[in-house]
A protein has these predicted regions:
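Short active-site neighborhood of thiol/selenol oxidoreductases, capturing the structured segment around
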Residues: 85-101, 123-126
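A short beta-strand-turn-helix
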Residues: 69-90, 113
């Protein structure tokens, strides 16, 4: 009697595995019919994996140039490609420091993040010692941000941001905005397409009406 079983790589179709088994035996391949089912399942997994890789490569190929960078998380060995992680989000990119008169802005930045994150806003913090106010190790910076301001938004490796020695990511932001950070807590706002739509100096607080209005208009 010939039995039929569904083929996983072709949902809804039926393959006569009894026939497959008899043909296999006739060629000296004494295999049980379920071997065919397993083979088809493995083929399906392979096709899915290949498709995911192709989609991922295509997404990177379409990545906005301002986000085409890989950055390491603060005090971590884990890195992330900014485009893969944050493409399609509105981004507020801020260079931070622990010993600055503007350090209290951490609290406002976290409030912004919590208020608008579900709508698509991401705040990205980049500690920098370019202005000699972040001498701490990355471990100490992370501890300070967590214990003092309960920072939950993503924080990244210590980064050069000033014009003369700026990190390539900050060079890209400055080239489009025409404005390099002159002090700690400079803010770049990027739209969902990865374009810099606004640049704010250190004195512009996270609860500034103009900043909030521009964020909301881009969400």
């Amino acid at each position: 009697m010939m039995h039929t079983y569904p083929v996983l790589s072709h949902p809804g179709s039926i393959t006569p595995f009894g026939l497959l088994w008899r043909i296999a035996c006739g060629h000296g391949l004494n295999k049980w019919p379920f071997d065919g089912l397993i083979i088809n399942k493995l083929k399906t997994v392979s096709v899915v994996a290949t498709t995911l890789v192709l989609l991922n490569n295509a997404a990177i190929a379409r990545c906005p140039k301002n986000l085409d960078f890989t950055k390491r998380f603060l005090a971590s060995e884990q890195s992330v490609h900014l485009c893969q992680a944050y493409a399609g989000k509105v981004l507020l990119v801020v260079n931070t420091a622990s010993y600055c008169g503007f350090t209290g802005q951490y609290r406002g930045l976290e409030a912004l993040y919590q208020q608008y994150r579900e709508a698509g806003l991401m705040v990205l913090g980049f500690p920098s010692n370019d202005f000699l106010q972040e001498p701490r190790s990355e471990d100490k910076v992370r501890e300070f941000c967590s214990l003092t301001y309960n920072v939950k938004f993503p924080m990244f490796e210590k980064t050069r941001v000033a014009k003369r020695h700026a990190d390539p990511f900050y060079q890209a932001l400055a080239n489009q905005s025409g404005d390099y950070p002159r002090w700690n807590f400079h803010k770049y706002l990027l739209d969902r397409q990865g374009n810099v739509v606004a640049s704010y100096g250190s004195s512009v607080k996270p609860d500034d009406e103009s900043l909030i209005s521009t964020i909301e208009s881009n969400l």
